[in-house]
């Protein structure tokens, strides 16, 4: 959202598109398209792959960038995005990555608020630089935390994405936000 707000671009929610089966978009001549995704198990969430496979864009796209957010390494997510978009005839001009607090709670501890705040501050600085590059329509692979053959580690994703390892404790207020926002309705 930060990038789209800074560049005055429209935001389209992948989760909302999947819920409403809305995959047809038209772009103005030379319009910029950006696809942002979190990294799951060194790759893309199945929802992002599903969205791209169903995506139909009419019009002449001007500049295409991808942005992946990750906790440890971006793995092969940028490689996967490039591959999936290529199947749709969409060529990426720039790839970006930003380290954020890792939110896969079965493994990562988010209870250290100072560490989370520090990671977010660093992310904000990185995002500001990315915004400047997007405005200038910079080209290149700026994914600084990818790993060679990172997409090969993605194999265990199907097992890891199961919700059986997730639980709540007494601090849960029962607001239902996690269930409401879950893109796969878990």
Regions of interest found by a model, annotated:
Residues 2-18, 24-37, 41-159:
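FMN-binding flavodoxin-like domain, especially the glycine-rich phosphate-binding loop
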